[in-house]
Swiss-Prot record:
This is Large ribosomal subunit protein uL3. SUPFAM superfamilies: Translation proteins. The gene is rplC. Residues 139-164, 215-240 are annotated as: Disordered. Keywords: Methylation, Ribonucleoprotein, Ribosomal protein, RNA-binding, rRNA-binding. Signal peptide: none annotated. HAMAP family: Ribosomal_uL3_B.
């Protein structure tokens, strides 16, 4: 199981195929996504990579956080996240993961925070049908109707779908296809919509319900902190 990456949503556009078909895509940008630390089964009970992306000023940063970035010898990061990996997919601390960590045509799962909608009614929030247009109904056409029973149970149960705050939820969209890659600018173009607003942080992982392409680099495609060579695809590593 390979590591994912932390990307930032740029926006949506479209690309054209050789046959003239247009594909709506979301542009995701890798902003200096580096490995900050390792989580091992011996020390932590599980195996994972801690990644950081973006830039952050140290003025209001706690001393403990500054020490973590200093120990990894990387610049302070705006966004930090962990990705579970297998033991053979560990990437050196300080390495920068590049856009060609993924390959064109593979499927990925993206996770982000949905756009906030504020206080919403039952029709917008839960797709309720509302009340009738006529037959004695006035003013309450967009009401949700009854919320409980009668004297028994005599209450509204917890988790009842009602009006309330909508959005700002953690959303994962499965099986988005990678359409194009721009390694120089660190861009990943995936087909379809990605949850979140422009500038929002997105976690991109290999799709769990799709097979990993044979030409996907293992443990990943990255650039070492000392300027060393990048990791080669699995086929090249095995001498195929």
């Amino acid at each position: 199981m390979r590591s994912g990456v932390i990307a930032q949503k740029v926006g949506m556009t479209r690309v054209f195929t050789e046959t003239g078909e247009h594909i709506p895509v979301t542009v995701l940008k890798l902003g200096n996504c580096q490995v900050l630390g390792h989580r091992t089964s011996e020390k932590n009970g599980y195996t994972a990579l801690q990644l950081g992306s973006g830039s952050r000023k140290t003025v209001y940063m706690p001393k403990a956080e500054r020490g973590q970035f200093a120990a990894a010898k990387v610049e302070p990061k705006r966004k930090v996240a962990e990705f579970r990996v297998s033991e053979d997919s560990m990437i050196p601390i300080g390495a920068e993961i590049q856009a060609d960590h993924f390959v064109v045509g593979q499927f990925v799962d993206v996770t982000g925070t949905s756009v906030g909608k504020g206080f919403a009614g039952g029709i917008k929030r839960w797709n309720f049908g509302g009340l009738r247009a006529t037959h004695g109904v006035s003013v309450s056409h967009r009401s949700i109707g009854s919320t409980g029973g009668r004297q028994d149970p005599g209450k509204t149960f917890k988790n009842k779908k009602m009006p309330g705050h909508m959005g700002v939820d953690r959303i994962t969209t499965l099986n988005l296809r990678v359409v194009q890659l721009d390694v120089e600018r660190g861009l990943i173009l995936v087909e379809g919509a990605v949850p979140g607003s422009k500038g929002g942080w997105i976690a991109v992982r290999d799709a769990v319900k799709k097979a990993l392409p044979a030409d996907a680099p293992k443990p990943g495609k990255f650039r070492l902190a000392d300027g060393g060579e990048q990791a080669a695809p699995a086929a090249e590593q095995e001498g195929v």
